[in-house]
Amino acid sequence: GFIYEASDVNAAPFYRAFNVSNRKDFAISHPFCQLLLGNNLVDHSGADITANPFEGMEDPRLALYATPNGDGNFVGMPVNESSSEAQVFTWESLPGDKIINVPDYNQSLMEYAEVSFILSELNGWDQTHYENGVRASMERWGVPAASIDAYIAALPPASEETVLTQKYIALYMDAHTAWQEYRRTGFPHTLLMPGTEFSATPVAGTTIDYTFTSLVEGLTDIPFRLQYPDFERTLNGANRSQAVSALSNGDALDSKLWWDVD
């Protein structure tokens, strides 16, 4: 992976934001935190898309992916929370120390865990490659061997959902690839969609109801693509128009790319 060479000039973005700019408005998301805790989301929309295939299994990577809050609990940031609210609310879990407190943090372009999950998919959701992927991801983050063995022993069998959900978990800090995987496969099913009504209990005795309201009117799913920048309209208008005409819904966030078949 790429390694930052000097903390004064090239400090890792999360390190700079947390330690230099004193930002506290970013945290592990509520759906992802619940997935790793082994919980199902409290979803009031009536959809069953938030079922956790690893229900009842707390993932040992959670303690490395995120930092406990002041009460010693892991609490994710609701998807509808504003930056100003995030600055005030102190109950949410920031990214882990290995992320925000390492000035030369590096991220691999492709890890062995991802390769293992690809091999599992290629071989009809193979169990061995599936387990190898989980083990490789946990070893990369420093999970103790005994915890890895116990977690793998409790895993449900390899399937499309379990393999691709574990792949998504392993892609933490590689958001672009995780987004691509969702668009390609439709997994994980634990993501919240625009319009979903849900509840979160950040502290004991405090339950807050939320509605995931999209900032883009009419959007009902996670965006499938980014729109062309405005300068393409003026500097490359003809080619832009030709490209837009080939999209399923024009230059919109919900137009699928050619490889996005699910």
Identify the residue ranges that each predicted region occupies.
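Hydrophobic-face positions in mid-chain alpha helices that act as interaction patches
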Residues: G1-L119, W125-A170, D174-H176, T185, ...
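C-terminal functional modules
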Residues: V134-R140, P144-D262
